[in-house]
A protein has these predicted regions:
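Transmembrane alpha-helices of Major Facilitator/SLC transporters
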Residues: 280-307, 322
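Intracellular juxtamembrane helix-capping segments at the cytosolic ends
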Residues: 41, 126-141, 266, 353-370
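Intracellular loop-helix junctions on the cytosolic face of multi-pass helical membrane proteins
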Residues: 1-18, 168-248, 269-272, 302-307, ...
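Central cavity-lining transmembrane alpha-helices of secondary-active solute carriers
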Residues: 59-80, 290-298
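Hydrophobic core of transmembrane alpha-helices in multi-pass small-molecule transporters
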Residues: 112-128, 337-355
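Glycine-rich segments within core transmembrane alpha-helices of 12-TM secondary carriers
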Residues: 142-169, 175, 197-201, 380-394
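Extracytoplasmic gate region of multi-pass secondary transporters
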Residues: 39, 242-275
Length: 456
């Protein structure tokens, strides 16, 4: 037996609390570090770049990366669904190295080619999430593990952008003097420099993740086996759940677009609301960390619900509340009841309460409650691929059809739209999957065998 195999066996036998802490930490660190290769470019404004287009240069960069990320999600439907355990770590490392190479290219090519470079940067990164989820899904504690993983991209987005802002200013990120660069880093080199700072931690985190053992027989009995899905199995899944999946995809398209807009232009929005240069150096980290703690507390509670149908209904209730909060928070801000910083924070809480379950928790419970054997990653990537396509459409709409609107004004309008559409589609999908779950007979015994797939 290899050293990795022996360590995996040891991990299988440790106390559940230790195992869950190890698994959650390794996954969190892996995806947290990935964001250092994706989001730092958004910390800069690129206001002095004239590239001869009605679309702002920063908007073009955002769209280019989203297009690459969306294309990656389409590729991930096949790649992540079919990736065997032995290939995952190598794939993760290769994807990140390709993304960093694209950031170096972004720094050295002319402005128009920089747009292409960010497309190439997004192209590998969209598959990282699915590969990490493959290590965590199908376990009795999947809700807890996936809740921690989901908080990684909430926290990391603010942290890596604050690191990028510190590099631009030539100061030490978070006061850690050993991280300071000799001088301010140029705007176009800052993304690559930030990624380089997180490369070694990423490699270490992937190594820890690779040591996780496969789900136990008890995990399989409770959550169904999660084998790779080939083309025929993927088509069978879509045929069986098409009405519900269609409603969820429509909701997710708008939530993804809203989340992306808030995330990519938070620096711009806060400067509009508080005055340029008055935003605290660690403001983004503080906002997103508070949001992440609240979301984690809510999502982790799902671990205590063993009945899959009840858990699924609870997840839809949480998402419904998140969509409602988008509209309520915007109404409070417009009426002067809360300030801009609190509004941005509540928008983050609302969108992530509705958005985070899509990234694993929701589909993991759908698979379990309907007794469909297969990896939830396929369903996640179907939603993701459509979601990022919607994000591109909304970015273009803002610059081409609402150029006079400020970033904060457009965010407020967008929040109202996302709230109304989200409430409608989530209600429809929730009722659909509740009926599907009610029609499934949960096995009365736990023996590790795979029960009926209920094929149509």
């Amino acid at each position: 037996m290899t050293i990795i195999g022996r360590i995996s066996d040891r991990l299988r036998d440790v106390h559940p609390a230790l195992f869950n802490g190890y698994a959650a930490s390794a996954a969190f660190a892996t995806y947290f570090c990935m964001y250092a290769f994706r989001k730092p470019f958004a910390a800069a404004k690129y206001g002095d770049v004239d590239w001869g287009s009605d679309v702002e240069f920063k908007t073009a960069l955002v769209i280019a990366q989203i297009l690459g990320y969306a294309a990656s999600k389409y590729l991930g439907i096949k790649v992540c669904s079919e990736a065997s355990r032995g290939r995952r770590a190598a794939l993760l490392v290769g994807l990140i190295l390709a993304a960093e190479a694209a950031l170096v290219l972004f720094a050295v090519v002319p402005p128009r080619a920089k747009v292409v470079a960010l497309f190439l940067n997004g192209l590998p990164l969209g598959m990282v999430w699915g590969l990490v989820v493959r290590y965590l899904e199908g376990r009795q504690t999947s809700e807890l593990l996936l809740a921690v993983l989901s908080c990684s991209f909430i926290v990391s987005s603010g942290v890596v952008k604050d690191v990028g802002r510190a590099l631009l200013a030539g100061t030490a990120p978070f006061g850690i003097e050993m991280l300071v660069w000799p001088s301010p880093v140029p705007e176009f080199w800052m993304p690559a420099a930030t990624g380089l700072m997180f490369l070694a931690p990423f490699l270490a985190a992937v190594g820890l993740l690779e040591l996780l053992p496969e789900p136990s027989p008890l995990d399989v009995a409770e959550r169904m086996q999660r084998p790779p899905l080939d083309g025929s199995a993927r088509r069978r899944f879509l045929r069986r759940f098409f009405p519900g999946i269609a409603s969820l995809v429509a909701c997710y398209m708008l939530l993804t677009a809203f989340r992306d807009y808030r995330d990519n232009y938070m620096v711009d929005v806060l400067d509009e609301l508080q005055g340029a240069g008055r935003t605290h150096p660690q403001a983004l980290s503080a906002i997103e960390t508070s949001v992440a703690i609240a979301v984690l507390a809510v999502m982790a509670c799902l671990f205590a619900i063993k009945n899959h149908r009840r858990a699924l209904a609870t997840i839809f209730g949480i998402m419904f509340a998140g969509a409602a909060l988008l509209g309520c928070a915007t109404a409070l801000w417009r009426n002067g009841a809360i300030d801009g910083s609190m509004w941005v924070t509540l928008l983050g809480l609302g969108v992530y309460l509705a958005y985070v379950p899509f990234n694993a928790l929701l589909f993991d419970r759908i698979m379990a409650s309907t007794r469909f054997a297969g990896t939830a990653v396929f369903a996640i990537y179907v939603a993701d691929s459509a979601g990022y396509s919607g994000s591109v459409a909304m970015q273009l709409y803002k610059d081409l059809y609402a150029p006079q609107a400020s970033r904060s004004e457009f965010l407020a309008w967008f929040a109202g739209l996302a709230s109304v559409v989200g409430l409608t589609t989530l209600a429809a999908a929730g009722l659909y999957f509740d009926r599907k779950s009610a029609s499934v007979r949960t096995p009365s015994h736990v023996d590790g065998t795979q029960h009926s797939l209920l094929s149509p």
